[in-house]
């Protein structure tokens, strides 16, 4: 029972780190990155469809992204979705591919993105700590109900603390890497 609680907590903490990785990857840096387009949905024949399912995304240069629609009929909808996104990009359709040239980030914009990244990192840390708190409450309940001894639960709580620390450290590493990437000119 204790092992189940620890495994479940570890699994949820892993998911929190993965969500943080995805969210930080979606924050624009000075370089082109296909992860920027993960959350863009295109209205394809009335159904919201992820951009990756409708087009191939290539990065031929550091600040240029080419989007090659599998169905040319979807090109105008893809372009519309890109303009409506919060990425601040200006796509141009040359008939074969949609080309996006990412403008150079200003210092002010870089600072805004760092602040956004820190917010997402803090959200991830909070969710890891919430998982820890829930698991600790479960362990306390087990002791109260007499289902396990205090020594076993104390050992499990130490393991839980180690898991929490390693996951928070992983989030901090992701965040510091993203900050370096954002502030690099």
UniProtKB/Swiss-Prot annotation:
Q: Which keywords does this chain's UniProt record carry? A: Cytoplasm, Protein biosynthesis
BP GO annotations: translational termination
Question: Per the record's keyword annotation, is Cytoplasm included, yes or no?
Answer: yes
Q: Which GO terms describe its molecular function?
A: ribosomal large subunit binding
Question: What are its GO cellular component terms?
Answer: cytoplasm
CDD domains according to UniProt: RRF
Indicate the principal place this protein occupies in or around the cell: cytoplasm
Q: Subcellular localization, per the record? A: Cytoplasm
Give the record's family classification: Belongs to the RRF family.
- What biological function has been recorded for the protein in this entry? Responsible for the release of ribosomes from messenger RNA at the termination of protein biosynthesis. May increase the efficiency of translation by recycling ribosomes from one round of translation to another.
Q: Which PANTHER family match?
A: MITOCHONDRIAL RIBOSOME RECYCLING FACTOR PSEUDO 1, RIBOSOME RECYCLING FACTOR
Q: Which NCBIfam families match?
A: frr
Protein name stated in the entry: Ribosome-recycling factor
């Amino acid at each position: 029972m204790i092992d189940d609680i620890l495994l479940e907590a570890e699994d949820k903490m892993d998911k929190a780190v993965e969500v943080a990785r995805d969210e930080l990857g979606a924050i624009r840096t000075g370089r082109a990155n296909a992860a920027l387009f993960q959350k863009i949905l295109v209205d394809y024949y009335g159904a919201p469809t992820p951009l990756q399912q409708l087009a191939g995304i290539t990065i031929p240069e550091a600040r240029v992204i080419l989007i090659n629609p599998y169905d040319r009929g979807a090109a105008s909808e893809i372009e519309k979705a890109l303009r409506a996104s919060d990425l601040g990009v200006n796509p141009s359709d040359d008939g074969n591919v949609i080309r996006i040239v990412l403008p150079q980030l200003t210092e002010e914009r870089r600072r805004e993105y760092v602040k956004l990244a820190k917010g997402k990192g803090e959200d991830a840390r909070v969710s890891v700590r919430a998982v820890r708190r829930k698991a600790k409450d479960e362990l306390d309940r087990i002791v109260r109900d007499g289902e396990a001894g205090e020594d076993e639960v104390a050992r499990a709580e130490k393991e839980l603390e180690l898991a929490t620390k390693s996951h928070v450290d992983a989030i901090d590493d992701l965040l510091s890497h993203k900050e370096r990437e954002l502030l690099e000119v």
